[in-house]
């Protein structure tokens, strides 16, 4: 199976590393998963016989530009690569844009037009125009998978749509942002104020340099929109979510909650057609009371009742785990 990776930051490099590490396993159980092109904002590296993935990672880390890949590197836009390079699947992992969805939206739609399946970790297009993307994929007869867009390594979307097939999902609640969960955990355990806990999260690389989307709840809002649309058949956008972040939470509030048998968590919730992201009181003994950077999602269903999945919600290798699962699904659906 021939693959184009669009976007070669932390997640793109994570996919390359996982495909390299798993190459023997994939060849033995499926077939060779060959990366024939990698693009970033500088250009591309293209080899129809398959790029050397360790070399690609080394070039990117040393020079910052994939176009510097020896002999196979060139100045070429991602759109032109999608149009001109023969491949089965495009893995779209450019940074998420929650305002317009681009460039990822354009990359995905262009892939569909060129009869290429798509796997993405990109929240932007999914949170803004999910219905359009699904309809375009169907129109062009290609598969569109996006497990990695919510919850990193946690199999949330595929669990609900495949393992729980036949169940009606009545509600979804969860902690879907590791940065905010880490900050609240530090505030609770060590009595730190919000600013100190945020500073520590930045120093450890857990929080982004600009953590606004995380701490204001926008990242979680995008994720629950994706879950509402993909699992519960809604047609929501990020504008439909009532959002409140964690910046006003104090260690005193956490202390008082603890005294009463509760903690405070940033919860994303889909229930009765409403989408909410806000700090909520969670019982200490609740499955939703996970610590540190862990994520958790709880489904309320008509048949299986409550189903809970917990896991690492971020990280290049964890996200690559979900992308690999989607790639294998596409192989099983098209190549067998």
From Swiss-Prot:
Recorded GO MF terms: homoserine dehydrogenase activity; metal ion binding; NAD+ binding; NADP binding
KW Metal-binding (keyword) present: yes
Reactions this protein catalyses: L-homoserine + NADP(+) = L-aspartate 4-semialdehyde + NADPH + H(+); L-homoserine + NAD(+) = L-aspartate 4-semialdehyde + NADH + H(+)
Binding site for NADP(+): 11, 94, 123, 205, 208, 315
Cofactors (names): a metal cation
EC main group: oxidoreductase
GO BP terms, alphabetized: methionine biosynthetic process; threonine biosynthetic process
Binding positions (NAD(+)): 10-11, 94, 315
Cofactor mode of binding and number, as noted: A sodium ion is seen in the structure; a metal ion may subtly affect the relative position of the nucleotide-binding region to influence enzyme activity, and could increase the stability of the enzyme.
Biological role: Catalyzes the conversion of L-aspartate-beta-semialdehyde (L-Asa) to L-homoserine (L-Hse), the third step in the biosynthesis of threonine and methionine from aspartate.
Family assignment from sequence similarity: Belongs to the homoserine dehydrogenase family.
Name used for this protein in its record: Homoserine dehydrogenase
Organism: Methanocaldococcus jannaschii (strain ATCC 43067 / DSM 2661 / JAL-1 / JCM 10045 / NBRC 100440) (Methanococcus jannaschii)
């Amino acid at each position: 199976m021939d693959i184009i990776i669009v976007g070669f930051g932390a997640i793109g490099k994570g996919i390359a590393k996982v495909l390299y590490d798993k190459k023997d396993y994939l060849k033995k159980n499926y077939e060779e998963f060959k990366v024939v092109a990698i693009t970033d904002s500088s250009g591309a590296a293209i080899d129809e016989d398959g790029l050397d993935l360790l070399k690609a990672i080394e070039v990117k880390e040393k020079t910052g530009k994939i176009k510097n890949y020896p002999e196979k590197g060139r100045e070429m836009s991602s759109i032109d690569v999608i149009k001109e390079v023969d491949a089965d699947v495009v893995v779209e992992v450019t940074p998420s844009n929650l305002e317009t969805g681009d460039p990822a939206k354009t990359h995905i739609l262009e892939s569909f037009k060129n009869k290429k399946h798509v796997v993405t970790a990109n929240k932007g297009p999914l949170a803004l125009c999910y219905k359009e993307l699904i309809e375009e994929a169907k129109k062009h007869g290609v598969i569109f998978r996006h497990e990695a867009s919510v919850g990193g390594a946690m199999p949330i979307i595929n669990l609900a749509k495949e393992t729980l097939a036949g169940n009606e999902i009545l509600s979804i609640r969860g902690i879907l942002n590791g940065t905010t969960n880490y900050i609240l955990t530090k505030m609770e355990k060590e009595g730190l104020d919000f600013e100190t806990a945020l500073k520590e999260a930045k120093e450890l690389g857990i929080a982004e340099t600009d953590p606004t989307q995380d701490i204001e709840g926008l990242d979680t809002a995008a994720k629950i929109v994706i879950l509402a649309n993909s699992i519960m058949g809604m047609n929501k956008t990020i504008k439909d979510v009532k959002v409140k972040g964690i910046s006003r939470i104090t260690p005193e509030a956490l202390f008082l909650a603890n005294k009463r048998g509760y903690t405070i968590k940033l919860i994303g919730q889909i229930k009765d057609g409403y989408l909410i992201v806000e700090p909520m009181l969670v019982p200490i003994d609740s499955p939703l009371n996970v610590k540190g950077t862990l994520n958790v999602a709880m489904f309320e269903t008509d048949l299986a009742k409550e189903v809970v999945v917990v896991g690492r919600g971020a990280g290049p290798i964890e996200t690559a785990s979900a992308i690999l699962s989607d790639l294998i699904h596409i192989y099983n659906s098209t190549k067998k």
